[in-house]
Amino acid sequence: LSGVNFFGLTENDRTFSVAKLFFVYGIGGNLIFPWYVGASCVLYAGPPRQAAAVLKTIETYKPTIFVCVPTVYGAILSLPDFNKRYDIGSLRLCMSAGEPLPSGAWNAWKDASGIEILDTIGCTETYHTFMANRPGEVRPGSSGKPIGGYDVRLVDDEGQDVPTGVIGNLMVRGESTALFYLHQCEKTRHTFRGEWLFT
């Protein structure tokens, strides 16, 4: 229920995600979480990188929460005066995941729209987001802090914790974490290490 508790979803919200429903990012952020609280969602069948179509959808259906990937934010930002040509005033929250969000794109979006983008990390194995920036506490270029119910750590290739400032592999644990991959014993052994998921 990270979407409900962390992002403050209510029955008055309307979500719009360009991520397709066969991705956990799309089905969680644009179907399961909004429906859980009685909110509505905008289902989008168009190509996600067609910025004008995405903006027209926002203008027409007036979502309050926009969920997409950095590539789409970049495509929108490449349209001159998009914020004057399209009404995106219904948005109260924007989220990003799927790839790193460059700090330059975050700053350009904030300058043009007045809205922060909350960069997040999640995966299919945890069902959705396990780390995110908080509203009003965003550090552009960072994916934030663990969401309640999840723990993370950085480890080396042998699974030993690395000191602060050292690059490592991200591990996560939480109640929604999968237990194994069906019929993939070797991949399961590599990825699921006790209660920790080796991302």
Residue spans for each PLM region:
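Conserved ATP-binding/catalytic segment of the ANL
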Residues: 160-165, 171-199
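Short coil-to-beta-strand transition motifs
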Residues: 145-149, 197
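Gly/Ser/Thr-rich phosphate-binding loop
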Residues: 39, 63-68, 77-139, 151
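A structural signal for the hydrophobic beta-strands that form the central parallel beta-sheet
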Residues: 17, 43, 68, 96, ...
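Conserved AMP-binding/adenylation subdomain of ANL enzymes
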Residues: 1-17, 22-64, 79
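Phosphate-coordination loops involved in phosphoryl transfer and adenosine-cofactor binding
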Residues: 11-12, 91, 114, 194
